[in-house]
């Protein structure tokens, strides 16, 4: 039984009651309630499409709620613009910070509300001094006069936080703030959040990562399908409780049970090399097998997959499909030979965001949906429906544009697109990156189903639990070379990290030749 949080001694600085927001054909928010308290972090948790982004836009004045009430310090407010929300002390720091590279740090901090002197002109010296004061207060190692374009992602996040403090925000919304940060930068962000709490600010922290939520949050609120389904103290719940609230059912295993049997060899790569990305890569892949690839950023994993798929050409090496030598010089040749690739960047490389779902799914399979040179709309819909239903795609209709889907559902569309070609080998590059835990479970279950049907799967992942939970074998890459090839029985987090970080030796040429 999940416990509800006791009423705190302080009243909430922000309270939402019965908030409703409807778009054509979709009820994005259905009588949602939420409370944020001073000096506390509330984690907002939910699957993609649960309504988190919509509630943020309502809170920041981008959307107007169709019904319900918002109060600040107990007084009803009506936000008709972002300026109204800012004036009420509410500001948001988004996953992709909205800043201007051509302006200085100070100009970005005070854009829209710069101090002004005589004749209404911007008082530049005062603006720089105030900006530097805020930066120093949050221990940001930045100068207010520095051009923003000279900063990295982590420091741009600090500028966004400084901008929130420049309007004396009492409520700070952080939407997936760690998505592009290193572990060191994440720890520094945690320290900054602790300081904001100590100043009495209320923080709404949106994250898919449970380790972050349990590290930083005092309270939680869970949304599911546009409804508020639970809230309470973090101290009273565990990960399983939150998952159950998110998906509406108990999820005992994010990684499905498999028998790990494998069939005949489907793919063999020998001596693949690239002038700058990888060297002397050899591997085999069998029907029904999930081969995991693990490594640190820059290890060459994605570059190797792009070469196998024909996006880039190797400088050396051979490839065999089912024992026969093949030439893979382009993605078209790879597809002809039964190899497909789901890229890490689904938005830029995997999906056409401006096209509807059914056209995305059927794009590489037009021979199945046309007759006499003419496309058959019914055949397109039937093919798209078959694969999207198997992947439990959540969408209003198959003619909905992919760009309007959540990240997890976009990923399902890309996977469906390539499965519709009936491949022998599917390469999944970071298949669950940036998607919620419910969508992850669905993708994992479908991967297991594909392997059970005899499809050969290569899974590139930077998530150790995913590597451990899904792989039959794992190849660890380091600096463009194979550092280790490990059977399932030999896998552990320590072993993976040791080989990826270079604590263990790389595989030598004679060891490569000993592989079956």
Curated annotation (Swiss-Prot):
This is Ribose import ATP-binding protein RbsA. Signal peptide: none annotated. It is found in: Cell inner membrane. Residues 14-250, 261-504 form the ABC transporter domain. CDD domains: ABC_Carb_Monos_I (cd03216), ABC_Carb_Monos_II (cd03215). Keywords: ATP-binding, Cell inner membrane, Cell membrane, Membrane, Nucleotide-binding, Repeat, Sugar transport, Translocase, Transport. Part of the ABC transporter complex RbsABC involved in ribose import. Responsible for energy coupling to the transport system. It comes from Jannaschia sp. (strain CCS1). Belongs to the ABC transporter superfamily. Ribose importer (TC 3.A.1.2.1) family. The complex is composed of an ATP-binding protein (RbsA), two transmembrane proteins (RbsC) and a solute-binding protein (RbsB). InterPro entries: AAA+_ATPase (IPR003593), ABC_carbohydrate_import_ATPase (IPR050107), ABC_transporter-like_ATP-bd (IPR003439), ABC_transporter-like_CS (IPR017871), P-loop_NTPase (IPR027417). The keyword tRNA processing does not apply. It catalyses: D-ribose(out) + ATP + H2O = D-ribose(in) + ADP + phosphate + H(+). It comes from the Bacteria. The gene is rbsA. One of its GO terms (cellular component) is plasma membrane. GO terms for molecular function: ABC-type D-ribose transporter activity; ATP binding; ATP hydrolysis activity.
């Amino acid at each position: 039984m999940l416990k509800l949080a006791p009423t705190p001694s302080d009243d909430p600085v922000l309270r939402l009651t019965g908030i409703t927001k409807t778009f054509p054909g979709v009820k994005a928010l259905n009588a949602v309630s939420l409370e944020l308290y001073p000096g506390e972090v509330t984690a907002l948790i939910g699957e993609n499409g649960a309504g988190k982004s919509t509630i943020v836009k309502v809170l920041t004045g981008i959307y107007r709620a169709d019904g319900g009430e918002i109060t600040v310090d107990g007084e009803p407010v009506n936000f008709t613009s972002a300026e109204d929300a800012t004036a009420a002390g509410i500001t948001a720091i988004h996953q992709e910070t909205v800043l201007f590279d051509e302006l200085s740090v100070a100009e970005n901090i005070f854009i829209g509300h710069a101090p002004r002197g005589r004749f209404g002109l911007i008082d530049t010296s005062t603006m720089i001094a105030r900006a530097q004061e805020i930066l120093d207060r949050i221990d940001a190692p930045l100068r207010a006069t520095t051009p923003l374009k000279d900063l990295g992602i982590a420091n741009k996040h600090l500028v966004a936080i400084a901008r929130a403090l420049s309007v004396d925000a009492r409520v700070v919304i952080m939407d997936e703030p760690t998505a592009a940060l290193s572990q060191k930068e994440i720890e520094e962000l945690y320290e900054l959040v602790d300081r904001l709490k100590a100043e009495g600010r209320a923080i709404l922290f949106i994250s898919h990562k449970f380790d972050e939520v349990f590290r930083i949050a005092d309270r939680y609120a869970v949304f599911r399908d546009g409804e508020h389904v639970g809230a309470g103290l973090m101290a009273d719940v565990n990960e399983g409780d939150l998952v159950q609230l998110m998906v509406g059912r108990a999820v005992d295993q994010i990684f499905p049970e498999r028998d790990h049997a494998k069939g005949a060899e489907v793919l063999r790569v020998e001596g693949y090399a690239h002038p700058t990305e990888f060297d002397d890569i050899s591997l085999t892949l069998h029907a029904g097998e999930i081969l995991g690839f693990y490594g640190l950023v820059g290890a060459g994993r994605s570059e190797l997959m792009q070469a196998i798929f024909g996006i880039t050409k190797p400088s050396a090496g051979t490839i065999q499909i089912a024992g026969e030598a093949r030439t893979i010089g382009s993605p078209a040749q790879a597809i002809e030979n039964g190899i497909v690739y789901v890229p890490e960047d689904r938005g830029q490389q995997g999906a056409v965001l401006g096209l509807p779902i059914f056209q995305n799914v059927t794009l590489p399979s037009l021979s199945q949906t046309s007759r006499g040179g003419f496309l058959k709309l019914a055949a397109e819909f039937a093919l798209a429906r078959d694969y999207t239903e198997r992947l439990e795609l959540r969408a209003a209709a198959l003619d909905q544009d992919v760009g309007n889907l959540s990240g997890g559902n976009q990923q399902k569309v890309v996977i469906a697109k390539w499965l519709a070609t009936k491949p022998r080998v599917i390469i999944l590059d970071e298949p669950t990156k940036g998607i919620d835990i419910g969508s992850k479970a669905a993708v994992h279950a479908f991967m297991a189903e594909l392997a059970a049907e005899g499809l050969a799967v290569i899974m590139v992942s930077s998530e150790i639990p995913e590597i451990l939970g899904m792989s039959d074998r794992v190849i660890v890459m380091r600096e463009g070379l194979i550092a280790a090839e490990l059977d399932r029985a030999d896998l552990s987090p320590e072993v993976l990290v040791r080989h990826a970080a270079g604590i263990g030796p790389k595989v030598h040429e004679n060891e490569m030749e000993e592989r079956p």
